[in-house]
Amino acid sequence: MRKALSAVALVAVWSVAGSLPAGAAQPSWSGDYSVERFAATKTGTSLAASQWEPDFADVYTFETTCTDDTCVATVVGGPAPANPTLPQPARYTWDGASWVHPYDWEWDCWMGEGNPKVWAPAHSEAYYTPQPDGTLVGSWRTDIASGPCAGSVIMDVAAYPVDPPPAFGSGS
């Protein structure tokens, strides 16, 4: 009986393995994307989470490279960040469901008009999950270690593909 069950289990495993695509496509986040951060609706425990700021977006060019089982989407074009402590270039690693970018940097805590910013160590993790329509949606969480802005800041993020202009003579 035990041999029969083992044989059935082995056949079932072979059946499932045989139904998987032989050369499944590797994930890719390449091309121009408008990356939007929904700062106006951010949340968290930090003083910074309650300071109003508008949503903001910039267009970035991403390029994906894969080696073995690891795929990384790197920002290869776009505006430089205002905060010089942000690691450059930004690199997002595919975790099987989302593009994830963990990094350490210095948060620049705004202390009001005319007052110097207070800098503090911070750790962020941004993730973007591909959607069926080609967009990516996710969240950006920052944990600020110390200072007047100590605590968390969490905001929704999204990336929208930027369509290239029509080619000359394409009739579009």
What are these regions (language model features)?
Residues R37-T41, T64-C66, P79, T142-I144, ...:
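Beta-strand elements of well-folded, non-transmembrane domains
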Residues A39-Q51, P81-P84, D108-K117, D143-S152:
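Short, cysteine-centered beta-strand-loop-beta hairpins and adjacent loop/turn segments enriched
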Residues A25-S50, P79, L136-W140:
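Tryptophan-anchored aromatic micro-motifs
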Residues E53-H123:
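Predominantly extracellular/secreted and cell-surface proteins with exposed
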Residues A25-D32, E63-T70, Y92-W99, Y127-L136, ...:
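A short, structured loop/turn motif at beta-sheet edges
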Residues M1-A24:
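Secretory targeting and sorting signals
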Residues V118-A145:
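Internal, hydrophobic beta-strand segments that form the core of beta-sheet-rich folds
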Residues V137-S172:
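Edge beta-strand at a domain terminus
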